Amino acid sequence: MLSELRSINSYNAWVVVFVAVGTIASAYGLAIIGSTVGEPGFYRYFGLAPKGTPGYDHTTNMVGALNGVNSAGAIAGSLLQAWTADAFSRKRTIQLGSVILIIGGALCSGAVHMAMFLVGRFIAGAGSGILTCIVPIYQAEVSTAETRGAMVAMTGVMYSMGYSLAGWLGYACYFTDPNSPRASFAWRFPLAAQVLFPLIVLAGSPMLPYSPRWLLQQGRREEALSVLERLHETPEDVQHIKAQQEFDLIDEQFKLDQTLSLGRRFELFRTAPNRRRALVASLLMWGDQFLGVYVMTNYGVIIYSNLGVTGSIPLLLNACWNSFTMIGNSWTAFSVDRFGRRTYLLTGTVGCIVSLIFLCALSAQYLGSDHLPGLRAAVFFMFFFIFWWSFFMDATQYVYVAEIFPNHLRPQGVALGLTVFYLASEVTLVGAPVALDRIGWKFYLVLIIPSACYLVTLYFLFPETKGKTLEEIGALFGDTNVATVTEGQRMEEGKNNTAELEKPEFASPEKE
């Protein structure tokens, strides 16, 4: 870990927060369908039968398809960014994802038949997949070791904000008269709003710096050092000593990677350390998805309706549920660097599993009855679940998957993790509406059993990464060729840096 002499500066904070708006765009695009399926006008426009009427089986299949094609698009986007992030830069990939999401959102909001809507959902999913992958990569690469957890956790904070906005806008539009000529406004306007955030990112993206690690890989050394100096300058380190130290560390790791010929195809699976990283990333994202958070987010309205909640209240509960995640993710951003990634993942998983067990038991006992205390208790455990997810899991997963891979494999590694994430969502989201209708409470067992296995893998396979540079994390996975700084060197450098800062004749590295 680099010396703690340095703290975050305002420019670094602005870069991280602004690029996280791309995560709002991604989350909103994924979540808005959860509000859409709660709008009566949506069912009428596309000729879908509501719950309790003949033809509802077809409706559940179509609702599952709307989420399925979105996840399929997200998989395509995740894989595409694995190439574009290295070929054209992280910055250009952020711009690409924004453009694609704008196109998809426009098609969804203007859809005149279901085929057009499905195509729009696929394209919007591709844009979301790109942004969900590339934003935490970029944030990790412009952050310091001491602040990386908080910086990348902004992905989770903004993700929850996107879901919250989707929930509240859907609730507000519910009160549009379904018999009026403007009835389609209730579902078209929330869908159209998803283009706003990628437009903001696209407009402001020219002001973003290129990733210093990507610049170094392209041989643009002076520009890389200049970016590091601007990102990490503080009043205590006006001579840019720490920026130079980090530059040297990145440069040394890049040279080691080159000497080991690490640019080969399928490098992600060639060595034992890389295979372990790939396994950990895949287990993390698959396991998190099977905890059921996307099921509750996208089908919360349906779940609340099954629990006897009627009218606009399911949409209101869904909006409140999503809003609560903002509090939890904000907590993670300020605390994950102190308590650690592994600790949070273990704690959150245990809490989520316990919540699912109680939700399953209460649903088994009271689903379909008029026993209000039992049904309300089931609703409570929906909110108890989101406490554990948002305070410990949501933001932490993005921090962890973005930091465990070396620089030259980070886009591919994160793409693998997020591809697995969306594959798992394909399984859960496509099957959930049919399963909730056909087998009811038994569906929760499909989530509980894999989640218990996931908890075991978390305990035995996931190392703690807090406080280490991206280059030093490699040693945790068994890399022997790692550019690092020993503890003794750190202490000595800290003394030398302090002494040098007191000398008026100290010459700082030249800026570009």
Protein language model features and the residues they cover:
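Alpha-helical transmembrane bundle of multi-pass membrane proteins
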Residues: 1-232, 254-512
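Cytosol/matrix-facing amphipathic helices and coiled-coil assembly/linker segments
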Residues: 243-257
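Short intracellular "coupling" helices and adjacent cytoplasmic loop segments at the cytosolic face
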Residues: 231-244
